[in-house]
């Protein structure tokens, strides 16, 4: 394991947040330093070449993380539990005893542990939290109707959306990401949460070809607009009749391009959720 790091000015925070955190599929951490005008960006990577690519692009430095330093990226922060509706609590502490304690304290909640520093997509970023709320709301309707449902997570990142879908009752769950680091982390988080029957694999959405014989009741696509728009037609084609498409990871200045692309593909008017500079869309296909 290697870590690339760089100290940046506060004025650069938005750029680096968009670069590393917006798609919820990189293992990045941005920390405010004691000097309020400076921040530290860290990206944890399995391969040294991946870290060197970041040096070529941004400068900074690379260190190899020794085994004794694993606590640095696995230790829980003091972040409070993240509540998603009345159904889910997201903790950043993967300790088994901690999870048992939380489950005992909150017997009517589903507990998900996503170590905060292992990858982005822990539930507290606007893109991820909005997706989680929408997925929970839709799944409650399926539960009430006692209907089987399926879920596909495009740009799975930490795997938190796929894990949530499975815990909320989805009978078929798949997730993919173009980043091999994200796949490693998603599989690790699935193990931490003892969730079975989630298929996670490496795939670039540009090369992804949905099967005519398989569709999903819910597809979540947490990806940038410049990746989403060229692929929106085939993503929409993979949504089952009466199914849902949840799009997130879209910056405010790009949301009009998504609306225009969706209209050109004959998609209905979406419900739009805005949180800060991020926009999410919820489309439902007719029967």
Feature annotation, model-predicted:
Residues 25-26, 170, 195, 267:
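A structural motif
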Residues 61, 89, 150, 172, ...:
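Conserved beta-strand segments of alpha/beta enzyme cores
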Residues 118, 122-207:
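Conserved SAM/SAH cofactor-binding pocket of Class I
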